[in-house]
């Protein structure tokens, strides 16, 4: 029976938060108002860390710049972003973790609250093609509208989106032998409690506390 290995992305497979880093890249490029974007970015990041993020307000802020450029321009920006802000924050151990599951024949999947535009090329670095992120709306002109569609994959939303993905494949979690989920954040406790093999990676204080209480493995890649 095949196993399913699910990974969070930010601060789990990469030692940074791509959602937080993207506005920093836009500021550096001079593509957004620096002071306003920095203030908003830091506020939303604190809220996320504290488990009280207003996902609608955050996505309105975070997705607006995507609507200003063509997908070709955004792809070029993303290549620069990856080289400067993402690749330097991936350790050999994180790559080896994914490879160990791939070599064992496990199905691998990333579920992230970060949007698909940002996470898809990052997941491809790990050879992961099953990717669930917050979905973006595309207009009739082929550009992103700045809106999202469906359920954002945050907190319980990760379970909703996982179940949708499984249903599309004619599966449930019970279709797999072991189900792993690797995450750093207390925001992911709903899904961590659902799988058979929860693993805390670079955990925040609340997740580390629960992991120790329940005997979950704890990995540190930072």
UniProtKB/Swiss-Prot annotation:
The cofactors named for this UniProt entry are: Mg(2+)
The catalysed reaction is: L-histidinol phosphate + H2O = L-histidinol + phosphate
InterPro entries annotated for this entry? Answer: HAD-like_SerB (IPR050582), HAD-like_sf (IPR036412), HAD_hydro_SerB1 (IPR006385), HAD_sf (IPR023214)
Give binding positions for Mg(2+). Answer: 8, 10, 184
Question: Record's superkingdom?
Answer: Bacteria
Q: Which GO terms describe its molecular function?
A: hydrolase activity; metal ion binding
Q: Which GO terms describe its biological process?
A: L-histidine biosynthetic process
Catalytic residues of the enzyme:
8 (nucleophile), 10 (proton donor)
Question: Without the gene, what phenotype results?
Answer: Deletion mutant is histidine auxotroph. Complementation of the mutant with hisB from E.coli restored growth on M9 without added histidine.
Q: Any note on cofactor binding? A: Binds 1 Mg(2+) ion per subunit.
Q: Does the keyword DNA-binding apply?
A: no
Name the pathway: Amino-acid biosynthesis; L-histidine biosynthesis; L-histidine from 5-phospho-alpha-D-ribose 1-diphosphate: step 8/9
Report the leader peptide range: none
Keyword annotations: Amino-acid biosynthesis, Histidine biosynthesis, Hydrolase, Magnesium, Metal-binding
Q: Which Pfam families match?
A: HAD
Enzyme Commission identifier(s) = 3.1.3.15
**Family, similarity comment:** Belongs to the HAD-like hydrolase superfamily. SerB family.
Query: Main role?
Result: Catalyzes the dephosphorylation of histidinol-phosphate to histidinol, the direct precursor of histidine.
Q: What is this protein called?
A: Histidinol-phosphatase
């Amino acid at each position: 029976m095949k196993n399913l290995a699910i990974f969070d992305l930010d601060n789990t497979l990469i030692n940074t938060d791509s959602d937080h880093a993207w506005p920093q890249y836009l500021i550096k490029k001079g593509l957004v108002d620096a002071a306003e974007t920095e203030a908003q970015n830091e506020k939303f990041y604190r809220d996320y860390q504290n488990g009280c993020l207003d996902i609608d307000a955050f996505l309105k802020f975070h997705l607006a710049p995507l609507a200003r450029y063509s997908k070709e321009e955004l792809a070029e920006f993303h290549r620069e972003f990856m080289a400067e802000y993402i690749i330097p924050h991936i350790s050999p151990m994180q790559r080896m973790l994914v490879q160990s599951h791939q070599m064992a024949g496990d199905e691998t999947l990333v579920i992230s609250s970060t949007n698909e535009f940002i996470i898809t090329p990052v997941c491809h670095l790990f050879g992961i093609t099953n990717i669930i992120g917050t979905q973006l709306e595309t207009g009739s002109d082929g550009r992103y509208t700045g809106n999202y569609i469906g359920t954002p994959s945050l907190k319980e939303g990760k379970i909703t989106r996982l179940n949708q993905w499984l249903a599309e494949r004619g599966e449930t979690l019970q279709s797999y032998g072991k189900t792993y989920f690797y995450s750093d954040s207390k925001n992911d406790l709903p899904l961590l409690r659902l799988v058979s093999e929860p693993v805390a990676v670079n955990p925040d204080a609340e997740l580390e506390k629960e992991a120790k209480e329940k005997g979950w493995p704890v990995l540190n890649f930072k």
